[in-house]
Design a protein with these regions (language model features):
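Actinobacteria-biased recognition of intrinsically disordered, low-complexity terminal regions
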Residues: 1-14, 143
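Short amphipathic alpha-helical heptad-repeat segments
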Residues: 13-36, 55, 71-87
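A structural signal for well-ordered alpha-helices, especially hydrophobic packing surfaces
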Residues: 35, 63, 67, 83, ...
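Charged, low-complexity interaction regions
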Residues: 37-49, 67-72, 91-104, 118-126
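Alpha-helical oligomerization interfaces
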Residues: 50, 54-61, 74, 78, ...
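Short, charged, intrinsically disordered terminal tails
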Residues: 120-143
Length: 143
């Protein structure tokens, strides 16, 4: 039996780039449902409620990072910055250790999934240059 949070084995199917935000958002909804008492499917055991809430928060952070950044590498950087901030905030009354464990696990899994998607995509230097030029035009035209 495994617990409710999915483990991302290396042989797991790749999540396409356009499905990543939805993938993380659905995982967040699932974990929040488990935290609120939804019966899990057969073969899945529930863990501590705070752990499920932490998992939900981590997946939601990943979904927000993916929706707010065009480049996957920027989303990964944002998630890593969130992790370092959490490490510096050691207040157990705000972030109980089961919540922290769930959050760390969810963000690490999301980062692994994003990196696997990035590694599977062929590098297209022309596309990267177009994105850079578009971003530069947007920044130059900003008031």
């Amino acid at each position: 039996m495994n617990d409710a949070g999915p483990d991302a084995p290396q042989d797991a199917p790749l999540v396409p780039r356009f499905k990543l935000p939805e993938h993380c958002a659905l995982a967040a909804v699932r974990e929040e449902a488990f935290a609120n008492g939804t019966t899990p499917p057969p073969g899945v055991t529930l863990v501590d409620v705070d752990t499920h809430r932490g998992l939900a928060a981590g997946y939601e952070a990943a979904a927000v990072a993916l929706r707010s950044h065009r480049r996957l590498s920027d989303a990964v950087d944002m998630l890593r910055r969130l992790m370092s901030r959490l490490e510096h905030r050691a207040d157990e009354t705000i972030y109980p250790s089961p919540w922290r464990a769930g959050y760390v696990r969810a963000v690490n899994e999301a980062v692994t999934t994003i990196e696997r998607t990035l590694a599977a995509e062929p590098f297209d230097p022309a596309r990267e240059r177009r994105l850079e030029r578009r971003v530069m035009r947007i920044e130059m035209n900003a008031p």
